[in-house]
Amino acid sequence: NYTIGNDNVLTEPLSEIKTAGLMYKMGVQ
């Protein structure tokens, strides 16, 4: 459970960054 918790902590921000990056690219284009 501890490892899964760490994965969630790392994955959550990464997915938000990827989503923000996609929205930024679509906004620019």
Swiss-Prot record:
Its EC number is 3.6.1.1. It is an enzyme of class 3 (hydrolase). The keyword Hydrolase applies. It catalyses: diphosphate + H2O = 2 phosphate + H(+). GO terms for cellular component: periplasmic space. Keywords: Hydrolase, Periplasm. The keyword Metal-binding does not apply. It is found in: Periplasm. GO terms for molecular function: inorganic diphosphate phosphatase activity. Inorganic pyrophosphatase is an essential enzyme for the activation of sulfate by sulfate reducing bacteria. This is a high activity pyrophosphatase. This is Inorganic pyrophosphatase. It comes from Nitratidesulfovibrio vulgaris (strain ATCC 29579 / DSM 644 / CCUG 34227 / NCIMB 8303 / VKM B-1760 / Hildenborough). The lineage of its organism: Bacteria, Pseudomonadati, Thermodesulfobacteriota, Desulfovibrionia, Desulfovibrionales.
